[in-house]
Amino acid sequence: MEVFVMSTSLGDEVIVMQSRSYSCGPAALATVLRNLGVNCTEAELAELAGTDESGTTMYGLIVAATSKGLRARGVKMELNDLRKNHIVFVKYGDTCHYTVIMSMDERNVTLADPALGRITVKREIFSRIFTGNVLVVERPCD
């Protein structure tokens, strides 16, 4: 994965790091929920999502997010439509991984990555590993 990492640093943002090799989904969801002001842990979300040693399904993450009172939906999305706090599913080689969009411009994508912390990736490289599968988590409309 180091091939496409331009920089890595932990900033002031809340980034929940994954505690197990297969818990990137719950950690990514915990990052988004905490940034939305929802108190949660990676372990709690992993249990709610049915995470096991093979990982977490997007459906499991939707169940976990809704159980915390938020709206969540899995969608297919184009790169240009990605926004802050979108949880994206990426694939490089045989590795599948959930990570969180922090910001994006015409050249770079900055991620809150549960395995690596805050990283910046060249947009061209990110476009090759981005699958188009996105989990959008939002507060319910009042």
From Swiss-Prot:
InterPro entries registered for this protein in UniProt: Peptidase_C39
Superkingdom, natural source: Archaea
Record keyword Metal-binding present: no
Keywords noted in UniProt: Hydrolase, Protease, Thiol protease
BP GO annotations: proteolysis
One Gene Ontology cellular component: membrane
Gene3D superfamilies for the chain: Cysteine proteinases
GO MF annotation list: ATP binding; cysteine-type peptidase activity
Sequence ranges assigned to domain Peptidase C39 in this UniProt record: 18-137
The protein's name in its UniProt record: Uncharacterized protein MTH_1463
